Amino acid sequence: MKNRGLLFALLILCSVISYAADFVGHWKGTVANLPIVFHISNDSTWRVSLDSPQQGAFDILCGEVVVKGDTILIDMPALQAIFKGVIAQDDKSIYGTFIQGIAIPIVLTRTTKEASRLNRPQEPQPPFVYHSQEVTFNNGDITLAGTFTKPIIGSKHKAVVLVSGSGAQNRDEELFGHKPFAVIADYLTRHGIAVLRYDDRGVGGSSKGSDDATTLDLATDAMAAVDYLKSRKDIDTTHIGIIGHSEGGLIAVINAATHPDDVDFIITLAGPYVMGKDILIKQNHLASEMAGMPLSESQAADVKEIIETIDASTDSIQLAADLRKIMSATGNHSEQEVEQTIKVMASPWYVAFVKLDPAKYLPQVKCPVLAMNGSWDFQVDATQNLGAARKTLPHATVKEYEGLNHLFQPSSSRQASMSYGAIEITISEQVLKDIVEWINSQK
């Protein structure tokens, strides 16, 4: 938030000093239908952390905390947000405002226990019945850190590299309280397949590299992982594949096309098979519909204009100016909202993704391909992308799973499938079984 520091200072000046309130404890409330819990402590200094259980997010550390009488001010840099609240006379409620671009009224009430962490029955727990090794490998001047797992029995194993979706993620592809790659690696290794999963650039033990990295740059990281597997004597170098989720699926396609002698098979989990711009336009429509707020014709036209503007851009400064002009004309957006959106949409990664066309690579993919999608995936639409996969890769095995979302989780309804963190299952058991069966069928 550009003026967050000033806003924080002004809120402090507006505070009313009264009595010494008791803010220490656990406080629950709801912001935009999402339950949240603040944990407030004071051991000589104030400390606040935040949980969003439904999103699977816990222990989000807050920044500066100021308490003056009955008023508390909490800065949340990780969320680009501020909370200001006034405690009731009985110390049982806090009446406040959650400010994140817009101001949302919220009432916090005391709770005697911390937010319940959702059960994750598939998350692997030691002791493991296979070998696990922390490893590093290099891609030029970038060091990537990961975990290599292999079965105890056998001397040379089929192997896969796991490649995560968009956004910097750790080796477990940890999101919404789930660890999909940890679950996949555990399942595959228990069934005789070696697995290498690694931290994305700038996460965990991996070095950051350039801020301008695009999908094509990240594809070279995945190939460095393949090269690492090829260097190991315990790997069957004629059976090394890439399993990519979302953007990672596109990376698998790119590397299968450009390194046909090194990539023996690929599996795309909700991988894009159409242009990035078409993915994003469809995603916007589906997300709005599933949230019960379908786009009007004018809103749909605005979305398309923004994406087409990015696709046609050749200069980042001019693109930012063009996006600013479009957004200023399409609604009541705050300056903060506009600038945050432009920062994302004019970034090298986003621009490159919009322009990236899998059709450039798909005709060159000759290795075996398993393309998988869930029917309730609103981020990478199954009909749109599996249809393209069938058309461009007639030799591919294509599977659509009814009632599964972008993470291949089952849910009770299409709308509920959007709440990844609220679903206990990390990934469908049937999907895991099909992956193992398909890999083992590759001779």
Protein language model regions, located:
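N-terminal cap/lid segment of alpha/beta-hydrolase-fold proteins
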Residues: 114-155
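Short beta-strand element of the alpha/beta-hydrolase
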Residues: 156-166
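Catalytic active-site module of serine/aspartate enzymes centered on a nucleophile-bearing elbow/loop
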Residues: 404-408, 412-443
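Central antiparallel beta-sheet cores of small beta-barrel/beta-sandwich binding domains
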Residues: 21-87, 93-100, 181
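Short alpha-helix in the alpha/beta-hydrolase fold that links the catalytic acid
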Residues: 367, 378-391
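Accessory cap/linker subdomain of secreted extracellular hydrolases
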Residues: 267-364
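Short beta-strand/loop motif that positions the catalytic acidic residue
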Residues: 365, 371-373
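Alpha/beta-hydrolase active-site loop
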Residues: 211-233
